[in-house]
Amino acid sequence: MGAEEEEEPASAVGREGGGGGGGARAAGAGAGGDTADDDDSGESAAAVVPCSICLDAVVAGGGDRSTARLQCGHEFHLDCIGSAFNAKGVMQCPNCRQIERGNWLYANGSRPSQDVSNDDWGHDEDFYDANQPETSRSVFLPFRFQWCPIGRLAQLPSVFDEGESAPPVTFHDFMGQNFTSEHLPVSAPGATPPGPYIAYFQPLQSSASSSSSHVTERTMDGTTYHDHWNPLPGPSDGRPLATVHPIDFHHNHWTHLPNSYSQPNSNNGVAEQMAIPVVPMRVGGLDSDSQQRGSLPSVYGNGSGSRSRIPSVPPMAPQFMRPHGNINEQYQQNSSSLYAAPQRRTAVQAVQDSMNFTLFPQAPTGPNSMETEDAGGNQFYAWERDRFAPYPLMPVDSEANWWGSTPQSHGVTDHSAAPGRRLFGQWIGAGRSPPPPPPPPADNSSYRQMHIPRM
């Protein structure tokens, strides 16, 4: 009676192993023979089935290796079936291809993290979109990681692509200056207003400069405007400058200003611009075979004299400033671009009290500075007392007017007899305090209160 009870599980195991092929059936037959031998001896033996993965015997109910029985009834070594599941990525029986559902557990009921299958998470629509392709799903989905599409990141360089104007240009030989223009255009026209261009200056060593070179620093914050005057030395023989390649400057705060264009000056070769245009303003850098010279929008002209003067060119100055000295010899008057003194008289008086300046006499700086014959009581320096970074020292001709529209307090000056004075800037480095003003000389000196309007 006990032998018959032993045969039934053995034959059942043989049928279960039949899905694995002939080897399983042979193992079932062998199991039956062993059972017959056990019947003769009267001892029970454990059923043995082969593992279709490693082809080793799977001892049911004991043995050195852990076993796993799937829902379909097939038994495998635990490490073998685990490797098969990991290789396929799905809990599928290698024999009957049936998909298992549930979680793998050890015999003691513990559930290790390495035995967790993503098949449980693959059918959970809470963690990913139903339209998401299968190739994008990974083991990170159970942890609710969101995949960032690379398509949008690849479009980032298009924001910085140049649509209409040239790439940023750097001019390395502005007689001691390094002018760089950078811009941030928008990728789609009309989507957003164009952003401002960024322009800055860096000092460079120049061997062709005959006078001290200086650098500008401009700060723009909303309606606040601040400039350091930047003189750019030019040719000394009166030759006109080479062709200027314009660089666009966009700024939304200046769209209310009138339009103007640069007018070449046959006397000193400076392209002066007295107002900032409505649409992109153009500041020129130029190319030449022998040497490179450049000019920015000029506010103050150069006085006429027997020798050619080095142009003093501040960048992007306010529209209402007028040059001083002999106007007829400094630039060519144009009614469409340059504005006469009576047209700017109201604007100067309206903002006259917004900024304070103090004038003090010039101190001699050596042979490399401006002409020594210009030094003395006829020349003063302007120093800003504003809350922003100070303006550099600028010599101002006491014989001529600071503004072209204000009446002269010292009478009419003969510019043909005395050379006109030039405005000259002084570089103030970062972290250094401005030099103290020198005491005024005893002869022909006074302090004057000046006002520079602020935009």
Curated annotation (Swiss-Prot):
Residues 15-33 have a biased composition (Gly residues). One of its GO terms (cellular component) is nucleus. CDD domains: RING-H2. SMART domains: RING (SM00184). It is found in: Nucleus. GO terms for molecular function: ubiquitin-protein transferase activity; zinc ion binding. Its EC number is 2.3.2.27. It holds the Pfam family zf-RING_2. GO terms for biological process: floral organ structural organization; protein ubiquitination; regulation of seed development. Residues 1-42, 286-311, 426-455 are annotated as: Disordered. Pathway: Protein modification; protein ubiquitination. InterPro entries: RFI2, Znf_RING, Znf_RING/FYVE/PHD. Disruption phenotype: Altered plant architecture, including increased number of tillers, enlarged panicles, and increased grain yield per plant. Signal peptide: none annotated. Keywords: Metal-binding, Nucleus, Transferase, Ubl conjugation pathway, Zinc, Zinc-finger. Residues 433-442 have a biased composition (Pro residues). It catalyses: S-ubiquitinyl-[E2 ubiquitin-conjugating enzyme]-L-cysteine + [acceptor protein]-L-lysine = [E2 ubiquitin-conjugating enzyme]-L-cysteine + N(6)-ubiquitinyl-[acceptor protein]-L-lysine. Interacts with SPL14/IPA1. This is E3 ubiquitin-protein ligase IPI1. It comes from Oryza sativa subsp. japonica.
